């Protein structure tokens, strides 16, 4: 009897072994391991797939969430509302930045953030909402965006489990989740919908100003070589992982 695994990474690799091997060898032979052509090409291809203006790759999904909050320039003590049913990373980055996480329960039918409870949780210090699209199912983004507009709040979408999923508005317009709020984030952890062979992540935005901020923050706060204008982090997707993801995105 053969054991059927929920996630079989070895079998996934075997199905596309030659393509992956060639992609990795090309990067190694190029000597361009950080911010090389593979990273730029993957970014452009993912932006096209997501129908979003800017994709900024980073080291992992946790960093993506942290960088998104940093780009919004929230202040210590500001409140960020998110769901209590999510991976720890969603909440830990809020605490790491000396912000206050406000956890609310989920809708029992969708397991996504409960919009009625969300409204009740908004206070004078609330600055942002972080909905989590869980199990490939989008949160109610129409309501969330309406609430954010009424209360002047930022929206950061945690899209680690739903890349590629579409949300349909009442008007009939469809958008990929992760591209609806101010910033979207995702993870390329191996077991994710789109997973690399290590750690990786990305941020999405249609806002040009935020895209510039994010690109600097993920690269030590540099907007010009050796000119560090803001406090940043070292969070770059390496070229090997980008090449692997570039192979996978075409499947």
Task: List where the protein language model places each region.
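Active-site region of PLP-dependent enzymes
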Residues: 161-173, 180-249
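PLP-dependent aminotransferase-like
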Residues: 70-166
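Hydrophobic/aromatic ligand-binding patch that stacks against planar heteroaromatic rings
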Residues: 92-94, 147, 176, 193, ...
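N-terminal "arm"/small-domain region of PLP-dependent enzymes with the aminotransferase-like
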Residues: 1-32, 37
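Active-site phosphate/pyrophosphate- and oxyanion-stabilizing loops and adjacent acidic/basic residues
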Residues: 44, 142-145, 174-175, 199
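Phosphate-binding glycine-rich loop
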Residues: 32-79, 93-97, 103-105, 170
